[in-house]
Amino acid sequence: MSIPSLDYRLFSHGDPAQRQQFCEDLVKTFAGYGFAKLRNHGLSDERVDEAFSYSNKFFNLPLHIKQKAKHPEAPNPHRGYSGVGQEKISAITGFEKGERSEVRAAELRESWDQGPADDELYANRWMPDEDLPGYRSFMESFFVECQTLHQSLLQCIATGLSLPSDELSSRCAKCSAELRLNHYPATPASSLASGACRISPHSDFGTITLLFQDSVGGLQVEDQQNPGVFLPVEPDDVHEMIINVGDCLSRWTDGRLRSVNHRVVSPTRLPGDADVMIPERHSLAYFGKPSRDEVVDSLPLFVPEGCKPKFADRWTALEYNQSKLMRTYNVETAAQG
């Protein structure tokens, strides 16, 4: 399986026919693969390089500095620095299928999370600016750039589905998205030999995820023709964006667009020697999400006449998000906010 690569410039600078074709191709790719590669997405190479530079600087800070903006042990607020092993994505493997394993595998990853600068429910957690000058200013502006692209892609999907262009983007008008920096420290291959992953198989919570990964590799996506088989998504270019469908968008479309399991393991090109050191890996992920009070059931317009909706439990986006966060941070209850 090879993830299709789409040229966003056909939409942003194309004629009406090219714009329509891009929208239809995006829908077709998301329906078949759940993932796509996106080039000419509008975030400049310089901005992406600067984001990776800040990620590297942040994670190289002494632990006591990073912990000035420490993520709480509880799920909320989902903000700030999480140390290696604090968040356990293995706890939500199979969540959408109703499979709730109690096995919480070791995951070799630390991360940083932030939300909108004006979020009244969950404030961001920042270190003093002198600890990493320019970090907060850059991250806040990069967040806005990602949000703008996210909304545009939702409009593309709606257009590709022959819906009003704001049918989906309007449901995300009050931003509750998150921007995450991930760092996977260098580790011996033997540390992944017993079933541990850099990040366990999971699907994303929200609408569309925008991802940049460095050149190390290790991202794998479940083959939709062969469930349980994971295939590598090798980075062609660190400036290329990988986008994928999240659970809420899949639910809205009654499963027409696929929210697909993915994971991060040892890069396939490395030898199988247990003594080999797997190099450190960085990724940047923007998790688009619905407005918190939006219901994330199947939308009636996607349910065939005479059929029952696949998703009809009346969860709001916030409730759905919390139901997964409570498991990843090993907490059984959390404030709904």
Curated annotation (Swiss-Prot):
Gene Ontology BP annotations: small molecule biosynthetic process
Disulfide bond residue pairs: none
Principal EC category: oxidoreductase
Listed InterPro entries: DIOX_N, IPNS-like_FE2OG_OXY, IPNS-like_sf, Iron_ascorbate_oxido_reductase, Oxoglu/Fe-dep_dioxygenase_dom
Signal peptide: none
Coiled-coil parts of chain: none
The protein's annotated pathway: Antifungal biosynthesis
Residues that bind Fe cation: 202, 204, 262
E.C. number(s) listed in UniProt: 1.14.-.-
Fe2OG dioxygenase domain boundaries: 175-290
Listed name of the protein: 2-oxoglutarate-dependent dioxygenase frbA
Obligatory cofactor(s): Fe(2+)
Pfam families documented for this protein: 2OG-FeII_Oxy, DIOX_N
Practical applications: FR901469 inhibits the activity of 1,3-beta-glucan synthase from Candida albicans and Aspergillus fumigatus. With minimal inhibitory concentrations (MICs) against Candida albicans and Aspergillus fumigatus of 0.63 ug/ml and 0.16 ug/ml, repectively, FR901469 displays greater inhibitory activity than other 1,3-beta-glucan synthase inhibitors such as, WF11899A, echinocandin B, aculeacin A, and papulacandin B.
The organism of origin for this protein: Dothideomycetidae sp. (strain 11243) (Fungal sp. (strain No.11243))
Residues annotated for 2-oxoglutarate binding in this entry: 281
Cofactor binding, per record: Binds 1 Fe(2+) ion per subunit.
UniProt KW keywords: Dioxygenase, Iron, Metal-binding, Oxidoreductase
GO molecular function, one term: dioxygenase activity
Induction pattern: Expression is positively regulated by the cluster-specific transcription factor frbF.
Family from the record: Belongs to the iron/ascorbate-dependent oxidoreductase family.
Record function comment: 2-oxoglutarate-dependent dioxygenase; part of the gene cluster that mediates the biosynthesis of the antifungal antibiotic FR901469, an inhibitor of beta-1,3-glucansynthase, exerting antifungal activity against the pathogenes Candida albicans and Aspergillus fumigatus. FR901469 is a cyclic depsipeptide containing 12 amino acid residues and a fatty acid chain. The NRPS frbI contains 12 modules responsible for the formation of the depsipeptide backbone which is denoted as Acyl-Thr-Ala-Tyr-Val-4OHPro-Thr-Thr-3OHPro-threo3OHGln-Gly-Thr-Orn-OH (C71H116N14O23).
